[in-house]
């Protein structure tokens, strides 16, 4: 455990949950694995306060606990990964709101705040209840409640319910009670179908190492395993341990909620310019919509939408946020940003449809908890997606043929290399209604866009043939490695210039080189090359290896080889990133404490939202400066978190 990640996680826990949580977490980080008496001794906290704090931290998944079978003693240790995800909460909620709507983001925020929660408890929370509609002049018109992005409409709610007096109030209360399950449960099922929440298992409260040791102990106690010896025993135990570990950690809730590889109710992704064609956003709206908008929206749902499924989720299920699945979704968003550098909007839309299909079938970014060393990581292909399935998800209004590039009519040839016949009317070809091409041509155009994405330098896609059908997939590990290299190269170029970037690329491609050979390949003067190498060596990006020619080890008889180790550089950059994030949070805390009294005044209920009325000109200027400074520091932390995700999580 490094110093700076421990410092960063302690700051995050203390800022989000208070000093008690921060003190317990810091004690566990300092002494690592402790029993309750030892933790009480080192933390110097009262027993009752410590027990309540530990119980709440276990609820938030900030602390692992494991009870030894031999001793019967419970050990506690910090969960750094869960503590770090506190910094990514805003990004996750923004993604959920964009994907599934505002109400889904509210539900996810509530689950994230509670750590984990039963469905029956979520039903009782007032913030998850639908807001009561307003009545005008005694007449009440019940607005239609709809979860855009999930195809869930408030069935059982009268569209036009005009009520008056006491009977009207009772009817309104009954309608609200009926609306609740049609709003919360479909949203939970939508989150579960996408994999963003999963069932809490007992193994989730134990560390990965404890789960592995427990599985190995259980397997080795079996009678058939005791009869094995040697290499066969090791291989069998390793295989069965991995299988048992997957079963214990599996909290998948997608069973019965996925149809043909797509979550039920998933909405077709709009193509470029789709937002301008529709005034409705992917969020929960509590306003009435006219019939034209309703018909337009209904045409965009998949055929197997969840709107007809009124079965609520089981009340006894305990759910939590599935951060591994969310990492997959955020990684796909980074791949889209990488593709946007060289591709058109239509190609990006096709690539997004492919990644969306792959996301539904991918549970985590990688199988191993740590990223293997450079060159030791094998290829890992995603589940292949058929070309026809991708074409079904593409927005029909997207011009696929024209976005690749028009051909000269005199030089136009078809797929067989022959000139097409002029079968149009007056020289004009009519593809279909609204200018749309036929299904066969559209599938071919989608394949052309995917083939364009498979070209160097990034090779974002790869074609496969499954059951004699063309399919496309993504090689995630090589793309994740490419993202890491691009991030390192961007940093090297920003610090040392393009000459240093050229030297690093040569060393990465050729391996260890002496100064003379490096100068010949990079075509740089010796003076410039030595200055760049010295500055990068001081920064830890390149290093020098001495290879003596004889046992005397004389400098004149020694070969000096320069090399670039991306793994060591990545680890060093990761530590520097943790340190920078920690310093940003410390600076933010210092600035907040310095303006504590003023900020308490601005956060009062009567002042908040009415700053111009209650604050002076000097105070308004100070508030504006504070908000700008806070946005700057938090924005820097979010940018650094993107770097951590690329270097560590993807």
Swiss-Prot record:
Transmembrane segments: none
Localisation: Nucleus
Stretch list, region Disordered: 133-163, 264-283, 288-313, 400-440
Acidic residues biased stretches: 149-158, 288-307
Any GO BP: DNA-templated transcription
InterPro entries on file: POLR3C_WHD, RNA_pol_III_RPC82-rel_HTH, RNA_pol_III_Rpc82_C, RPC3, WH-like_DNA-bd_sf
Keywords of this entry: DNA-directed RNA polymerase, Nucleus, Transcription, Zinc
Region (Leucine-zipper): 577-598
GO MF entry, a single one: single-stranded DNA binding
Gene Ontology CC: RNA polymerase III complex
One of the Pfam families matching this protein, by short name: RNA_pol_Rpc82
Superkingdom to which the source organism belongs: Eukaryota
Protein family membership: Belongs to the RNA polymerase beta chain family.
Subunit: Component of the RNA polymerase III (Pol III) complex consisting of 17 subunits.
Function: DNA-dependent RNA polymerase catalyzes the transcription of DNA into RNA using the four ribonucleoside triphosphates as substrates. Specific core component of RNA polymerase III which synthesizes small RNAs, such as 5S rRNA and tRNAs.
Full protein name: DNA-directed RNA polymerase III subunit rpc3
């Amino acid at each position: 455990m490094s110093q700076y990640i421990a410092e960063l996680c302690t700051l995050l826990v203390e800022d989000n949950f208070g000093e008690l949580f921060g003190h317990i977490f810091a004690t566990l980080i300092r002494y690592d694995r402790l029993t309750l008496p030892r933790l009480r001794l080192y933390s110097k906290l009262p027993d009752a306060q410590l027990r309540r704090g530990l119980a709440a931290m276990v609820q938030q998944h900030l602390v692992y606990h494991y009870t030894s079978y031999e001793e019967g003693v419970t050990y506690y240790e910090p969960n750094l990964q869960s503590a770090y995800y506190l910094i990514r909460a805003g990004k996750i909620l923004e993604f959920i709101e964009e994907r599934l709507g505002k109400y889904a983001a509210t539900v996810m925020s509530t689950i994230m705040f509670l750590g984990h929660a039963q469905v029956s408890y979520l039903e009782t929370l007032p913030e998850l209840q639908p807001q009561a509609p307003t009545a005008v002049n005694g007449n009440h018109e019940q607005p239609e409640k709809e979860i855009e992005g999930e195809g869930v409409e408030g069935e059982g709610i009268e569209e036009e319910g005009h009520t008056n007096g006491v009977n009207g109030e009772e009817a309104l209360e009954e309608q609200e009670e009926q609306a609740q399950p049609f709003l919360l449960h479909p949203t939970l099922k939508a989150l579960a179908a996408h994999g963003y929440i999963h069932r809490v298992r007992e193994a989730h409260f134990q560390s990965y190492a404890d789960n592995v040791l427990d599985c190995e102990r259980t397997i080795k106690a079996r009678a058939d395993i005791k009869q094995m010896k040697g290499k066969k025993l090791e291989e069998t135990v390793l295989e069965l341990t991995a299988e048992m570990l997957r079963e214990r950690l599996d909290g998948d809730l997608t069973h019965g909620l996925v149809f043909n590889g797509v979550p039920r109710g998933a909405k077709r992704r709009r193509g470029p310019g789709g937002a301008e064609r529709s005034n409705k956003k992917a969020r929960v709206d509590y306003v009435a919509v006219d019939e034209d908008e309703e018909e337009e929206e209904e045409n965009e749902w998949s055929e197997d939408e969840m709107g007809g499924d009124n079965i609520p989720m089981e009340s006894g299920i305990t759910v939590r946020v599935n951060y591994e699945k969310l990492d997959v979704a955020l990684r796909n968003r980074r791949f889209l940003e990488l593709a946007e550098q060289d591709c058109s909007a239509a190609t990006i839309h096709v690539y997004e449809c492919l990644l969306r299909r792959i996301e539904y079938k991918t549970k985590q970014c990688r199988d191993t908890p740590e990223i293997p060393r450079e060159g030791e990581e094998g290829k890992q292909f995603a589940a292949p997606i058929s070309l026809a399935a991708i074409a079904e998800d593409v927005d029909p209004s997207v011009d696929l043929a024209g976005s690749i590039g028009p051909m000269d009519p005199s030089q136009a040839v078809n797929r067989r290399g022959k000139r097409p016949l002029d079968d149009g009317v007056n020289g004009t070809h009519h593809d279909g209604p609204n200018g749309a091409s036929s299904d066969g041509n559209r599938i071919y155009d989608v394949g052309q866009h995917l083939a364009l994405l498979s070209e160097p330098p990034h090779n974002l896609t790869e074609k496969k043939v499954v059951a004699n059908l063309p399919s496309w997939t993504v090689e995630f590990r090589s793309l994740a490695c490419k993202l890491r290299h691009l991030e390192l190269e961007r940093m090297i170029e920003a610090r040392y210039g393009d000459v240093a970037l050229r030297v690093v690329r040569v060393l990465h491609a050729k391996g260890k080189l002496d100064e003379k050979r490096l100068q010949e390949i990079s075509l740089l003067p010796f003076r410039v090359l030595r200055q760049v190498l010295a500055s990068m060596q001081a920064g830890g990006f390149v290093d020098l290896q001495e290879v003596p020619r004889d046992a005397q080890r004389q400098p004149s008889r020694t070969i000096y080889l320069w090399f670039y180790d991306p793994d060591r550089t990545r680890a060093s950059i990761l530590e520097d990133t943790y340190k920078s994030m920690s310093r940003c949070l410390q600076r933010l805390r210092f600035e907040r404490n310095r303006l504590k009294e003023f900020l308490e005044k601005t956060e009062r209920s009567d002042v908040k939202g009415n700053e111009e009325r209650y604050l002076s000109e000097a105070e308004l200027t100070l508030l504006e400066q504070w908000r700008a400074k806070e946005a700057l520091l938090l924005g820097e932390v979010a940018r650094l978190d993107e770097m951590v995700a690329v270097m560590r999580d993807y």
